[in-house]
Each structure stands twice: as structure tokens, then as C-alpha cells.
């Protein structure tokens, strides 16, 4: 606490961080914290009641946030021929085939999301050790392996994000910027929760949303009442 200024100490003292708040209250707490010189990202961390070691309880998918992410993405597309031209016309930042594969093998990963046409996946699959740990590998479930590269790029620009439960059963995602109106942030978070609930594996038993924390880049983590989220 000694690293925080007087204002943030006063704000944090007025809240009980041992309890869970409504989603709206949690967002309000974050927005009351002092601003910094950049527009902070609002992140959520969701512990799911799954056993990710079991193949029938792995969760991965995508959702279009209704109000976007507030982030300008660098989009890479693995494609050749007419599909490469289509991707360039649609506004992709990087487009290529074997040349991009070799560049990434060399350690270059200066992009935020990758899209690939199905015919490219044989070569792209060889990049698993580089792209996998960074959640950059294109997948059909996320809609990033597709022949319709124009649609994929447009959806990503509008706010489509991928979600995935890690080995601990935790899903982390950015859901907007702190400058967003409180209701816009709430709508984005509810859209993500709805997608996660729809993706619940039939084999998962017991409480599904175990814990839910919302935070900003430089702000505290606020626990949110999961009962509200399950009901929304």
C-alpha cells in the first residue's frame, strides 16, 4: 500500500476486498482509481470448474464483444494467391505463406492475432511451439482458420476475441479500455460470460464459474459475485 498515492489509498480503504461485488460495483471501483498516462486495459480472470487435463473438459472459443476492445490489432494472415490479395484488400497488416512461416521460425511474433486458410495449416502447424504458448495459433473453433478471410478480419476489427482455459482452468481476457462507459464495459463482460456458459462441457460438474476477478492494467483486482454472472 505504501506505493499507492493518498487518493488510491483512500479509495481502497473504502472497500472490503475480502468480499465479492456486483459487476457494476467492481467496474465503478476501477474507474475511481487514479488515471495514468495511458488508457488502461480492463481484464477479467475467470476460474472455471473444469478439469482441463481431461479432453472432454477443455474450453476454447470466440466471442464478439458488442462494444469492441478499444485496441488496434496487428492482424497476420497466412494465405496464398487470390486469398492473399483478398486479405490485403481487407486490411490485414501482414500477409504471406512460406515466407511468414520462416520469419516466425526465426523468432518474429510482432502481431496480435493470426488467421489462416485451411490449405496453409500444414505449414502453420509446424509453428506450434512458437505460436501455441502465445495463443497465436489459428484454430477453427476461434474462426481463424477459414476461407473467408475478409469476414474473419472484419470480425476481429470489430471486437471478436478468443477465449481459452489454461492448464489451471483459468480464462483470462481483455474486455475493453478503462475509458469506456461503465455500461459498455458491463455489456462486453456479460457477452464473454454468456459465451463461456454456453461453452460449458457436459462433463463439467458442480459450480462452473468458481471465481471472477476484474482489474485494470495498473489497478486492483476486484472479486465479482459469480451468482450474478450465471444469472445474466
Curated annotation (Swiss-Prot):
Subunit field text: Part of the 50S ribosomal subunit.
Keywords: Repressor, Ribonucleoprotein, Ribosomal protein, RNA-binding, rRNA-binding, Translation regulation, tRNA-binding
InterPro entries the record matches: Ribosom_uL1_bac-type, Ribosomal_uL1, Ribosomal_uL1-like, Ribosomal_uL1/biogenesis, Ribosomal_uL1_3-a/b-sand, Ribosomal_uL1_CS
Gene name of the record: rplA
Function: Binds directly to 23S rRNA. The L1 stalk is quite mobile in the ribosome, and is involved in E site tRNA release.
Provenance organism: Chlamydia caviae (strain ATCC VR-813 / DSM 19441 / 03DC25 / GPIC)
Pfam family, one: Ribosomal_L1
Family: Belongs to the universal ribosomal protein uL1 family.
One GO molecular-function entry: structural constituent of ribosome
Recorded GO CC terms: large ribosomal subunit
A Gene Ontology biological process term: translation
Domain of life: Bacteria
Protein name: Large ribosomal subunit protein uL1
RNA-binding found in the keyword field: yes
Amino acid at each position: 500500500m505504501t506505493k499507492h498515492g493518498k487518493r488510491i489509498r483512500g479509495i481502497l480503504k473504502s472497500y472490503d476486498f475480502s468480499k465479492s461485488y456486483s459487476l457494476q460495483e467492481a467496474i465503478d471501483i476501477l474507474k475511481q482509481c487514479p488515471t495514468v498516462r495511458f488508457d488502461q486495459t480492463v481484464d477479467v480472470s475467470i476460474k472455471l470448474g473444469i478439469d482441463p487435463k481431461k479432453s472432454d473438459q477443455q474450453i476454447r472459443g470466440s466471442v464478439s464483444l458488442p462494444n469492441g476492445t478499444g485496441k488496434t490489432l496487428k492482424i497476420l494472415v497466412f494465405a496464398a494467391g487470390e486469398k492473399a490479395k483478398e486479405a490485403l484488400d481487407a486490411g490485414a497488416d501482414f500477409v504471406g505463406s512460406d515466407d511468414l512461416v520462416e520469419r516466425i521460425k526465426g523468432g518474429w511474433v510482432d502481431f496480435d492475432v493470426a488467421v489462416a486458410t485451411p490449405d496453409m495449416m500444414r505449414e502453420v502447424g509446424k509453428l506450434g511451439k512458437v505460436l501455441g504458448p502465445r495463443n497465436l495459433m489459428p484454430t477453427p473453433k476461434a474462426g481463424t482458420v477459414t476461407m473467408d478471410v475478409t469476414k474473419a478480419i472484419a470480425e476481429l476489427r470489430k471486437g471478436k476475441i478468443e477465449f481459452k482455459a489454461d492448464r489451471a482452468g483459468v480464462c483470462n481476457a481483455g474486455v475493453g479500455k478503462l475509458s469506456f462507459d461503465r455500461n459498455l464495459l458491463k455489456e462486453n463482460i456479460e457477452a464473454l460470460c454468456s459465451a463461456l456458459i454456453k461453452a460449458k462441457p457436459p462433463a463439467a460438474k458442480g459450480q462452473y464459474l468458481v471465481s471472477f476477478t476484474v482489474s485494470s492494467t495498473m489497478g486492483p483486482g476486484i472479486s465479482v459475485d459469480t451468482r450474478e454472472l450465471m444469472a445474466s
